Structure formats: structure tokens, C-alpha cells
Curated annotation (Swiss-Prot):
Protein name: Protein FdhE
Gene Ontology terms: biological process: protein maturation
Disulfide bridge partners, by residue number: none
InterPro entries in the record: FdhE-like_sf, FdhE_C, FdhE_central, FdhE_N, Formate_DH_accessory
């Protein structure tokens, strides 16, 4: 099953009602999103062997919060949604949608916000990005979207992605359409932008007990039923792994049919759990899954594969 975004004026009244039963999509709620992520990263940094890197990621997340409100995006996506709906494509498809210069404006604003907080190699990286040409930055963005990680150093990628993510999240937040679920292919990718998930979460509140995958780019969440591989949609050979016990708030769901895994975070076990922060802070579980022979089916926006990985 895939999820297609339907323009508002094409939805009948019955579709509007049924769409409210199980929301197939949860568009990004940007208010305090990055501040919450930064706070969670700082909290998880305590007594964590990755503490320094988690605090570094928290600085980027906080900068995203500041830049988000200093540089709002105004854009009418109505025509784009209609066109994408007719083609059966994500409206903000990273492989098709032309990038506006706004994302590079966001990158420069992030660099300006982060410079006073950075030193050593990290400062050298953002100064290098600051001096890069417009075309060089576009080439790096294209390489990341094509999963050509060998073309973008892993120390530059988080900064480039942070700006791209802000831009795509702003656009996703402006989508004036609704979404409905219909059968199709490639449910493992974000139905809004076509990017990969970072993790999945079993939620509380109005979506109690439902699993949503969280996009690592536009921050949209989309519904995928539990006990089904989010990568290949098979259900016969799933296994669940944790470092603590069966009641752990973070587990890895592995699939022997496709040989991949994705983390599942349980809000009922820890209401403060956060899709990006807790995924990054639990890399020990990733190491265990790699030892077991499984490949990760997601990418964390603060941790990209380097050349040869």
C-alpha cells in the first residue's frame, strides 16, 4: 500500500470523513520541533559514549529552529500538488522538484548561526561550505539525494542536509491538500518527498498504537501497519531486537526476507522519545544489527555513510 496526496478540491465529502479515521499522513508540525530535538539530544548526551557528537547535533538542531523563524518560506504549491497527483508521484519529489535558491539562503543562515559555537575541524568545515560556489553546493545536494555519499564528505553532509531539510519541511508544511491511502508500490519512501525514513514510532495520543515512519528530510510521518517490514512489506520473517529487555523503548525490527532493519521507538515506554535524537543516541543497537548481518534501511540526518561504507 502506498499513500498518494490528493488536492483538496478533488476530495469528496466521504473521503474527507474517512481520511480522519486513521490519518495516513502527519504533516510536519514545525513549532518547536527543532527545539524539542535539541533538548532531547542534550538530555541523551549525558552518560552516553557519543555525548560529544549528540551535543554537536543539538547545536545544529537549535540553529535550525532559529533559522526557521528568521527565514519563512512563502510558496503556492497547489499547481504542484495537482500535477504530482495526476502523475502518481510525491508532490515534493527530491528527484524531480527543482530546488529554489531559498535552501542555500537557509544554509548560509545556519552557518552564520553556528559559527560562534564551532571550533577546530567543525569550524573549518562550515567555513569551507561558506566559500563554496552555488554550483558546488547544488552538486553536493544532488549527490546526497542520489545516495552518492562518496561524493560528499560525511563531515559536510549534515550541514547540507540540515538546510535541505529545513527547506523541504517548510514546503511540506504548506501543502494545502489532504492524503488518502491507496494500493501501490514503494511505501518505504516518504509519500511527500520520496526520501528515506530515519526511524519509525508507535505513537500515543490520538494516534495511539499506530506506527508511523518519520521522514529524514521533510519531517512528514506516514502510517505503516505494525508487524510488516517497512522496506519490503513482507511479514513472515520479522525479528525484534533490543539492548535492554522486551519492554525497551527502542527496538530494531529486522526482516530476513530483505536483510534490512529499521528501529521502532515506543512513545508509551518513553513519551519524550524523538525520532531523530533517539535513533542517533542508540548506535550501539545499530552495531549489534550489523554484527547480525542486517543492513540499515534508513539514514539519520546527522550521520551519513562515508566513502567506502
Amino acid at each position: 500500500m502506498s499513500i498518494r496526496i490528493i488536492p483538496q478540491d478533488e476530495l469528496g465529502s466521504s473521503e474527507k470523513r474517512t481520511a480522519d479515521m486513521i490519518p495516513p499522513l502527519l504533516f510536519p508540525r514545525l513549532k518547536n520541533l527543532y527545539n524539542r530535538r535539541a533538548e532531547r539530544l542534550r538530555e541523551l548526551a549525558e552518560n552516553n559514549p557519543l555525548g560529544d557528537y549528540l551535543r554537536f547535533a543539538a547545536l545544529i538542531a537549535h540553529a535550525q529552529e532559529v533559522v526557521l523563524y528568521d527565514h519563512p518560506l512563502e510558496m503556492d504549491l497547489t499547481a504542484r500538488i495537482k500535477e504530482a497527483s495526476a502523475q502518481g508521484k510525491p508532490p515534493l519529489d527530491i528527484h524531480v522538484l527543482p530546488r529554489d535558491k531559498h535552501w542555500q539562503k537557509l544554509l548560509m543562515a545556519l552557518i552564520a548561526e553556528l559559527k560562534p559555537e564551532m571550533s577546530g575541524p567543525a569550524l573549518a568545515v562550515i567555513e569551507n561550505l561558506e566559500k563554496a560556489s552555488t554550483q558546488e553546493l547544488e552538486d553536493m545536494a544532488s549527490a546526497l539525494f542520489a545516495s552518492d555519499f562518496s561524493s560528499v564528505s560525511s563531515d559536510k553532509a549534515p550541514f547540507i542536509w540540515a538546510a535541505l531539510s529545513l527547506y523541504w519541511a517548510q514546503m511540506a508544511n504548506l501543502i494545502p491538500g489532504k492524503a488518502r491511502a491507496e494500493y501501490g508500490e514503494q511505501r518505504q519512501y516518504c509519500p511527500v518527498c520520496g526520501s528515506m525514513p530515519v526511524s519509525s514510532m508507535v505513537q500515543i495520543g490520538t494516534t495511539q498504537g499506530l506506527r508511523y515512519l518519520h521522514c529524514n528530510l521533510c519531517e512528514t510521518e506516514w502510517h505503516v501497519v505494525r508487524v510488516k517490514c517497512s522496506n519490503c512489506e513482507q511479514s513472515g520473517k520479522l525479528h525484534y531486537w533490543s539492548l535492554d529487555d522486551e519492554q525497551a523503548a527502542i527496538k530494531a525490527e529486522s526482516c530476513d526476507d530483505c536483510g534490512t532493519y529499521l528501529k521502532i521507538l515506543y512513545q508509551e515506554k518513553d513519551p519524550k522519545i524523538e525520532a531523530v535524537a533517539d535513533d542517533l543516541a542508540s548506535l550501539v543497537l545499530d552495531a549489534r544489527m550489523e554484527q547480525e548481518g542486517y543492513a540499515r534501511s534508513s539514514i539519520n540526518p546527522f550521520l551519513f555513510p562515508g566513502e567506502g561504507e
